Amino acid sequence: MKYIVNFLVTVCLFMSMTQSANAQKDYFKDLPENCSPEKVGAILSRHFIPSKHMWYGKGKWIHYAEVCTWYGALRYAEITGDKQLAEQLKDRFDLLVTTEKSHLPIMNHVDLNVFGCIPLELYKITKDKKYLEMGLSYADTQWTLPANVTSEEKAWADKGLSWQTRLWIDDMFMITILQAQAYHT
């Protein structure tokens, strides 16, 4: 009996996954040409390059929403093989870390540390160690307790989580994307 139940559960799960995959596949099938994911991705990514920075902390540091946009544009360039776009995104980053260096986020909060996913993605594309070192420094500070740690932050660290853990959905993404990037490099 247990074998039959396990078999039926497996069949149901397989059918459910197959149906979900087919539904997702069909969703993008009939889009107008100008609305394809490739076209929209190219437009959004190229729009980002000349845009002004978004600021966090009264104009001090790059905002995490810009970081997420930048990361998405880099992933788009990598997936589509758009070397020109990747180079433009790299140039924007290089300008930030040289000419606009005062706007590099400090490493004391998840909203700021997520910045590290950009140099880590650039490292994956270019293999330039300067990007790896910068990105890993942002990732590593999520595990190093600061001198002024709060009891709540220490409690997260004592559970084996980053001291920057907060149970906000965007924070869960931001910690995960940075740590996943660090792991993959």
Regions found by a protein language model. Give the residues of each.
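Mid-chain, structured segments of secreted extracytoplasmic proteins
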Residues: 82-121
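Low-complexity, Ser/Thr/Pro/Gly-enriched N-terminal "stalk/linker" regions
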Residues: 24-94, 128-137, 141, 145, ...
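The feature captures the catalytic groove of carbohydrate-active enzymes
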Residues: 141-184
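Glycine-rich flavin
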Residues: 112-123, 129-140, 153-158
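Bacterial Sec-dependent N-terminal signal peptides
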Residues: 1-24
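Well-ordered alpha-helical segments within folded domains of soluble proteins
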Residues: 62-78, 108-124, 167-184
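A ubiquitous short alpha-helical element
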Residues: 55-59, 101-105, 163-164
